[in-house]
Curated annotation (Swiss-Prot):
Gene: araC
Binding-site residues, alpha-L-arabinopyanose: P8, T24, R38, Y82, H93
Keywords: Activator, Arabinose catabolism, Carbohydrate metabolism, Cytoplasm, DNA-binding, Repressor, Transcription, Transcription regulation
PANTHER family registered for this protein in UniProt: ARABINOSE OPERON REGULATORY PROTEIN, ARAC-FAMILY TRANSCRIPTIONAL REGULATOR
Localization per Swiss-Prot or TrEMBL: Cytoplasm
PROSITE patterns, per the entry: HTH_ARAC_FAMILY_1, HTH_ARAC_FAMILY_2
Protein name per UniProt: Arabinose operon regulatory protein
Gene Ontology MF annotations: DNA-binding transcription factor activity; sequence-specific DNA binding
């Protein structure tokens, strides 16, 4: 049986978390000097900031060279094929893997270098602040305190908002109000164990098929997958900040069966609810 990979810099790491962040210091011929190759992308988003050297991003025959100050955004399902540029002696890049909050979506619509890979380069006046924010996200994300992940998520939100301040917002149409309302309805009914897409669609005056299409088009994920992410996120919050019994936590996010809740939670996070709670203490 293969051992679990606990280093997010190496292939095989599961990324079963709402936020993981770090620095990848690639030196020529070093142990990290290989190309990341994920043809199907990932379930969440990845932000990538080059701080030293040069990297190269490949996507179906096209290439992009990233240099210090460049920020790339890989959305769910986007091809990941990148590494140190062969003409550079190093490529140091910071990165943040995350599952976004629903209301972030219009902040995640970036101009693309190709396919769906987004690109942003702050001007010289703003660059130091973005570098500082990235470092703060990594420090918080790697912390072991009860609120470390929430702090990292809030810092990431600040980074996304700082970017929105720095660009012409008219280039980015807002999220469809029906999708936004659907997200709010789902969030308000996480405890409903009889949830179905038809009830959400009826609430926003769409057919289930049309809602499913719009949801995936704008959020890059299915209705049910998004709801499961929100349920697990809320369960983690309740487990880490209250002494509520695990069965009650499960019922609060729509799981009447505690054993089934525990199985789903462990599948999504890599830890059982009791293990997760113990790690927060």
């Amino acid at each position: 049986m293969a051992e679990t990979q606990n280093d997010p810099l190496l292939p095989g790491y599961s990324f079963n978390a709402h936020l993981v962040a770090g620095l990848t210091p690639i030196e020529a011929n070093g142990y990290l000097d290989f190309f990341i190759d994920r043809p199907l992308g990932m379930k969440g988003y990845i932000l990538n900031l080059t701080i030293r050297g040069e990297g190269v991003i490949n996507n179906q025959g096209k290439q992009f060279v990233c240099r210090p100050g460049d920020i790339l955004l890989f959305p769910p399902g986007e091809i990941h094929h990148y590494g140190r540029h062969p003409d550079a002696s190093e490529w140091y890049h910071q990165w943040v893997y995350f599952r976004p909050r629903a209301y972030w979506q219009e902040w995640l619509t970036w101009p693309a270098i190709f396919a769906q890979t987004g690109f942003f380069r702050p001007d010289e006046a703003h660059q130091p602040h973005f570098n500082e924010l990235f470092g703060q996200i990594i420090n918080a994300g790697q912390g072991e305190g009860r609120y470390s992940e929430l702090l990292a998520i809030n810092l990431l939100e600040q980074l996304l908002l700082r970017r929105m301040e720095a660009i012409n917002e008219s280039l980015h149409p807002p999220m469809d109000n029906r999708v936004r309302d659907a997200c709010q309805y789902i969030s308000d009914h996480l405890a409903d164990s009889n949830f179905d897409i038809a009830s959400v669609a009826q609430h926003v005056c769409l057919s289930p098929s049309r809602l499913s299409h719009l949801f995936r088009q704008q959020l890059g994920i299915s209705v049910l997958s998004w709801r499961e992410d929100q349920r697990i996120s809320q369960a983690k919050l309740l487990l880490s900040t209250t002494r509520m019994p695990i069965a009650t936590v499960g019922r609060n996010v729509g799981f009447d069966d505690q054993l089934y809740f525990s199985r789903v939670f462990k599948k999504c996070t890599g830890a059982s609810p009791s293990e997760f709670r113990a790690g927060c203490e």
